[in-house]
Amino acid sequence: MLGIITFIIIFGILVIVHEFGHFYFAKKSGILVREFAIGMGPKIFSHVDQGGTLYTLRMLPLGGYVRMAGWGDDKTEIKTGTPASLTLNEQGFVKRINLSQSKLDPTSLPMHVTGYDLEDQLSITGLVLEETKTYKVAHDATIVEEDGTEIRIAPLDVQYQNASIGGRLITNFAGPMNNFILGIVVFILLVFLQGGMPDFSSNHVRVQENGAAAKAGLRDNDQIVAINGYKVTSWNDLTEAVDLATRDLGPSQTIKVTYKSHQRLKTVAVKPQKHAKTYTIGVKASLKTGFKDKLLGGLELAWSGAFTILNALKGLITGFSLNKLGGPVAMYDMSNQAAQNGLESVLSLMAMLSINLGIFNLIPIPALDGGKILMNIIEAIRRKPIKQETEAYITLAGVAIMVVLMIAVTWNDIMRVFF
């Protein structure tokens, strides 16, 4: 149960942070955001703000999305002869078009619609008391659809495809950017929780409770200078010296550890503890605890994590295998393991997954943010927009590829994790 809760929290935070990036910069670019959804499936709660954005909390606590005006099937269609109730503002402009039998306004004007243009001319025409009349429609007017859903109309100037190239590009990039920011922040938080960043350039150590070194008398911040005669000046020297000293070690044999404590040099016999195929002496690298060290340490972890992911991506391209990919099932398995290991493991996993999500979404495949960014760049170079039909077909092809890949990866994960 703890693993499921951890998975939902991690996955939810990653997606919400990602989608908030798209949402925020879409609004800043003048694009009408129709909906910001947390979760998937049926609505549990909804609220419409003054800007016409619907905020929804949905039943399945997995994922979320941002729906922008002009994306996909976003056209409002009113069939000829459809009865509607028009509510006018003080200037005589239509501020509400009610196509349903609910949410009726007693002051509204009944009409049978014969024509409309809610994108360019912003007008609606129809029969009012058997007389044909045309009314101007307010730029921020709303439509109550037949099922009772109320949405804002989307004039051309607030649709995604009519925003500036720069506006669309930053809107598409903002999702991955937010994931990178989240990953860096969580890594910095992790370093602060750990008390600092491991100092691998030093031979000072932290001694693990009940470990081999602790039993031999070593204490935190002691300085190991030699192991079995091998000189130690750094953490890398220490690990290599332990490896060399224990290479042919018998079950009850010890190694000699020379260390400096309170300016006094001591040599003790330490019996290493075996873990799997390696020996340890129960020490960790000392920590750099300065505020600046912690900040830089978090950035270093994020940078290292990004390079690890990029190398994995490179390996995937040069030698593709489903076993190198992981979907929601693999993510659940990792979340479950992290939950068992404590908060620090959960934060480390969240940070890595956030950076991974950011990098993955920048791959220039249609349907991913990277594909949209690539089309924005092509449009900027050509200095003319890509046809909506062409863009739709390209995106559809990308979606098909991603769906097939996700099904294959999920099936492979299920077989690997549960069987």
Swiss-Prot record:
Spans traversing the lipid bilayer: 169-191, 301-323, 343-365, 392-411
Membrane topology type: Multi-pass membrane protein
Record-annotated PDZ domain positions: 175-274
Class in the EC hierarchy, top level: hydrolase
Pfam family, one: PDZ_2
Gene Ontology annotations for the cellular component aspect, listed alphabetically: plasma membrane
Catalytic residues (UniProt): 19
Biological process annotations from GO: proteolysis
Gene3D superfamilies the UniProt entry points to: 2.30.42.10
UniProt-listed Enzyme Commission number(s): 3.4.24.-
Chief location: membrane
Cofactor(s) this protein cannot do without: Zn(2+)
Cellular location(s): Cell membrane
Binding-site residues, Zn(2+): 18, 22
Keyword tags: Cell membrane, Hydrolase, Membrane, Metal-binding, Metalloprotease, Protease, Transmembrane, Transmembrane helix, Zinc
Single annotated GO MF: metal ion binding
Record's keyword annotation contains Transmembrane: yes
Family: Belongs to the peptidase M50B family.
PANTHER family: MEMBRANE METALLOPROTEASE ARASP2, CHLOROPLASTIC-RELATED, REGULATOR OF SIGMA-E PROTEASE RSEP
Name of this protein: Putative zinc metalloprotease spyM18_2031
Organism, as annotated: Streptococcus pyogenes serotype M18 (strain MGAS8232)
Lineage of producing organism: Bacteria, Bacillati, Bacillota, Bacilli, Lactobacillales
